[in-house]
Amino acid sequence: MWIGVGGHFEENESPDECLLREVKEETGLTLTSYKMRGILTFIYRDICEYVCLYTADGFEGEMTSCNEGELKWVPKDKLLTLNLFEGDLIFFKLLLEDAPFFSLKLTYDQVNEHRLIDANLNGKKLELFDILDENGVPTGLTRERSLCHLLDTPHRTGHVWIVRPVKANNKIASDTQADTSQNKPAYELLLQKRSHDKDSFPDCYDISSAGHVPAGSSVLDSAIRELSEELGIKASPSDLIPIGTHEGNSHSIFYGKPFHNHEFSTLYLYTKPVKIKDLVLQESEIQSAKWFDLNQLMEDVKNNAPGYCLY
């Protein structure tokens, strides 16, 4: 594992004094320009440590060998490819983004010391996902949400498709919102329009209800929760009909940044009656909901029509 230089405070030392001494002892260098960037709280094996996090861009002297490990200069754009603790990946990403001074709390599992079980940034809980192997099986490790999409990390999602049949006269209980073909068996899918502020595919129509599976949670529980949070639908486990799994991997650019989405998705159907006027939409995630004719929707997808979340 790779870590930065540093160590424990000696008696009566200030953070700056500890920094200067440790860097000198471990590298032989004398820092001439440095800045405190954040405070880290590490919890592991019933131990709580507070770490003052610095970066330095000025030094003098010649680098010496270190009796505590190997010293190596690493290009900034390669930092996140190193073998690092998952919590370290979080604060390295913050440093690379030149984030303002931050407080990051990281809690590791007492048995598996490499498994990050909780992360809080400036008092706000961060989302952690189970890291999957090539077969979609959890490895026992977790990773923060934005890092999963930055580093192309496979993770789990649950997808719920809300479907309804169209009656012969093309009228559906005063809630018709899609044109249908009279020559084909007709079904409609309910799609949600993603909010303008989403980090991927803003303003595009997407699955009826979908979401990531938090680390340690089941896909079914997550799918039920997302239905409630996004659409206000209170479903029971028996209401969701499992129809399969799907592995998807897309590579896009959003807001000038790479966005990789490697998902192992469990798919469900929800066939109970749904009226758009009765939905309670999660405004931070969804602009609106609309019924789409399934046959026309399939044609749009085949033709890669704009306005949909396709990958």
What are these regions (language model features)?
Residues 1-25, 39-41, 110, 114-123, ...:
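Conserved Nudix-box catalytic region and its N-terminal flanking loop in Nudix hydrolases
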Residues 166-186:
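Intrinsically disordered, low-complexity terminal tails and inter-domain linkers enriched
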Residues 28-62, 76, 196-197, 228-276:
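Active-site segment of metal-dependent pyrophosphate-handling enzymes
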